């Protein structure tokens, strides 16, 4: 092995393989572009984005880590959202949650 060399497995890598994406239609009602990163809690995105915000509680974009989706002014597009995993605790963003999220429909209850 050469220092810094990557040894990658053959084949495709499936993102979020164990999570089912849910489609959401989103409209930018503002006058400026809005960009949302891969792990931003979608429930708490810019208020100029119009969508079923309550249904997006505990969800994030179903896109590769480190990437983003851009919504131009007046643009409507459909995005896929997946549940946060792990401890499902959300802090920061717009401060709407600041703690544990409700249990995802496809997740067992956390005990601790």
Swiss-Prot record:
Main localisation: cytoplasm
NCBIfam families noted in UniProt: PRK13203.1, urease_beta
Quaternary structure (record): Heterotrimer of UreA (gamma), UreB (beta) and UreC (alpha) subunits. Three heterotrimers associate to form the active enzyme.
Species of provenance: Thioalkalivibrio sulfidiphilus (strain HL-EbGR7)
UniProt similarity note: Belongs to the urease beta subunit family.
Location(s), subcellular: Cytoplasm
A GO biological process held by the record: urea catabolic process
Residues annotated as signal peptide: none
Gene3D superfamilies hit by this protein: Urease, beta subunit
EC number: 3.5.1.5
Keyword terms of this UniProt record: Cytoplasm, Hydrolase
Keyword Cytoplasm: yes
UniProt pathway: Nitrogen metabolism; urea degradation; CO(2) and NH(3) from urea (urease route): step 1/1
GO CC field: urease complex
GO MF term list: urease activity
InterPro entries: Urease_beta-like, Urease_betasu_sf, Urease_subunit
Name of protein: Urease subunit beta
Catalyzed reaction equations: urea + 2 H2O + H(+) = hydrogencarbonate + 2 NH4(+)
